[in-house]
Every structure is written in structure tokens, then in C-alpha cells.
Curated annotation (Swiss-Prot):
Pfam families: DHDPS. This is Trans-O-hydroxybenzylidenepyruvate hydratase-aldolase. It comes from Pseudomonas sp. (strain C18). It comes from the Bacteria. Encoded on an unnamed 75 kb plasmid. Signal peptide: none annotated.
């Protein structure tokens, strides 16, 4: 059977709304062994996708940092994306991830995964050599020119990509039609970036969504969620309450959910340090998810499979807190 799934026209920013969940790449028990060659649990992958769609998520992102884009083989990536596309069957939009170390490899992977059926790619810049602004801008222009049918989500993580994604960058990205959205960290410069990039749907982190939506209710209509991998009910509840608050002016419930999320995340970051967290991002996120019990993330692929035990304890505590929130808000959604 062909892996190809018929797609509609390229996504636009207007298609990006609601709760966008970022998936891990579930692993087999032997995934931490470098000798292993087929480490993706495809059955669990399909189950997670079905459960996310049943829960009501608006879109799915994959193969970012804790999605282990950096440590999957090309065969594993193709099998994983094929499974997701075949499971989704066009019911929600899906961005794969094709970040790599050079433009030609990014284009090759993007072409193949879009051909399989992904709607777009979540894409960071190559990071072996630190990029300046003109190089980063040209990189995205080249990918857009090479794969014009692919929607692009800018993966704006300064820690991962050694690039600050400065204000002029966003102004240039807004000129590329394929760039429709961005996985966005922090909201200190959000108001300015919204003005510089009027054609891009910025996705703040779920912890920041309430505050971001208050900054600009019309433009901020979607967010990215990793906590949903501990159970999606909290993210769905936040989405719905922000929509309601925009209509009624009563933001109290949305703020309460946001506060719950922040509290659950409080032990995830070692010493409250995002830079330290970023060294162990994959292991900490997968430990959080496994502790929550909603999915089976499985062991990390090498070389990123070593994490300090005390850091893991904080991640596991966070996962259990998110599991409690999922139970709480599942009852409220009934």
C-alpha cells in the first residue's frame, strides 16, 4: 500500500489555531543501544496519534528536540512519519521535522516527507557553525524555494540552534509565503515580533499562552504543548477557556489553568535553569512523559541517554503533577 496521503493546498497562518501538540518518537526497549537499528515503536506512535485526535487537538508537530530528530536514522524517520500520516488520514494538520546540518540534506528530507504526506515541517537552522542573520534568512528562503508546497514552522529555540532569532529575522521571514507559523519561546518581545511578522502565526508555549493571548487576542490563537504528552485534557481546557475569555472578558479560569501548568512545570527545569535543562532536554521530557503514564516514550537514543538522577527525579515529579491535572480537567471536560 502506498504511504502517500492526498493533501489539500498548502497551509496558511489562518489554518493554525488551537492546541498544537508536540510528540516524542516512542522508542523500543533497546533504543539506548547503539547497535539497534529499528528503534521506533510504531504501534505506540499510531496509538498516541489516535488518542490525540480523539481528545480534540488541532494539530500535531513532531521530530523536534525531544522527538529525537538528531538521533533517528533516515529509515526510522520515514517509517515514523509514514505511520503518523497514515493514522491521521487528513483529520488534523501535521508538521514533521527535518532539521539537519546543511541545506541540501534539509531539502532532501523535506521533499521526501512532504511526498509521504506531511503538511509541513518544523525547521530549525543548521547549527554546527553558528549562523549570522543573512545566512539564517537565506537558509529558509532556499528551503521554501526548493519545496514550495511545504508549509514551514520556524523552530525558534536559541539554545538548540545557537541563533537568537532576532527582530530583523522575523521581518524577513514574514516575506516568505511558506513560513506560516513559529514554535516560539518566551513572550518578552512578542508584541514587537507580531508587528514585524504580520503573516506568521506565533505559537507560544502553553505556559505562556494565557499571557500571550492577553497581549494580542486576535493574533494569538494557538499554542504548542509538550505537557499534553502527559495527558491532553489540560491543554484542551486551556484552549477552550481562552476562546471563552476572549468572548466574555472573564479570564479568571484561563489564568487558573495557566497557573496550574506553571506549577506542574516547576520541577522540570534543573535549578530553574533553561540552559541546564537544554543539555538534558530529551531525557528529562521523556522521563516526565513516562512518569505521567499517558504514553510510553521509552528510552533515549544515544548519545543523549545519560541524565543526572536528581534531574530525572524533578522531571518525574513534574510528570506526575501533569497526570493529576489531566485527571482533573478530564472530569471538567465531560
Amino acid at each position: 500500500m502506498s504511504n502517500k496521503i492526498m493533501k489539500t493546498s498548502r497551509l496558511t497562518a489562518e489554518d493554525i489555531n488551537g492546541a498544537w501538540t508536540i510528540m516524542p518518537t516512542p522508542s523500543t526497549p533497546d533504543a539506548s543501544d547503539w547497535r539497534s537499528t529499528a528503534t521506533v515503536d510504531l504501534e505506540e506512535t499510531a496509538r498516541i496519534v489516535e488518542e490525540l485526535i480523539a481528545a480534540g487537538v488541532n494539530g500535531i508537530l513532531s521530530m523536534g528536540t525531544f522527538g529525537e530528530c538528531a538521533t533517528l536514522t533516515w529509515d526510522e524517520k520515514r517509517d515514523y512519519v509514514s505511520t503518523i500520516v497514515e493514522t491521521i488520514r487528513g483529520r488534523v494538520p501535521y508538521f514533521c521535522g527535518t532539521t539537519a546540518l546543511n541545506t541540501r540534506e534539509v531539502i532532501r528530507q523535506t521533499r521526501e516527507l512532504i511526498d509521504i504526506g506531511a503538511n509541513g515541517t518544523m525547521l530549525g537552522v543548521p547549527m554546527w557553525v553558528k549562523m549570522d542573520l543573512p545566512t539564517a534568512v537565506q537558509f529558509y528562503r532556499d528551503v521554501a524555494d526548493a519545496v514550495p508546497e511545504a508549509a514551514i514552522a520556524i523552530y525558534a529555540n536559541p539554545e538548540a540552534f545557537k541563533f537568537d532569532f532576532p527582530r530583523p529575522f522575523w521581518a524577513e521571514m514574514s516575506k516568505i509565503p511558506q513560513v506560516v507559523t513559529a514554535k516560539y519561546l518566551g513572550i518578552g518581545m512578542l508584541d514587537l515580533d507580531l508587528r514585524l511578522a504580520p503573516n506568521i502565526r506565533f505559537l507560544p508555549h502553553e505556559d505562556d499562552y494565557y499571557a500571550a493571548a492577553r497581549i494580542n487576542p486576535e493574533r494569538i490563537t494557538a499554542f504548542w504543548s509538550s505537557g499534553a504528552m502527559c495527558g491532553p485534557a489540560t491543554a484542551i481546557m486551556l484552549r477552550d477557556e481562552v476562546v471563552r475569555a476572549k468572548s466574555t472578558g472573564d479570564w479568571a479560569k484561563a489564568k487558573a489553568i495557566s497557573d496550574d501548568m506553571r506549577a506542574a512545570d516547576s520541577t522540570l527545569f534543573p535549578r530553574g535553569d533553561f540552559s541546564e535543562f537544554s543539555k538534558y532536554n530529551i531525557g528529562l521530557e521523556k522521563a516526565r512523559m513516562d512518569a505521567a503514564g499517558w504514553l510510553k516514550a521509552g528510552p533515549c537514543r544515544p548519545p543523549y541517554n545519560l541524565v543526572p538522577e536528581d534531574y530525572l527525579a524533578g522531571a518525574q515529579k513534574s510528570g506526575k503533577a501533569w497526570a493529576a491535572l489531566h485527571a482533573k480537567y478530564s472530569n471538567e471536560l465531560k
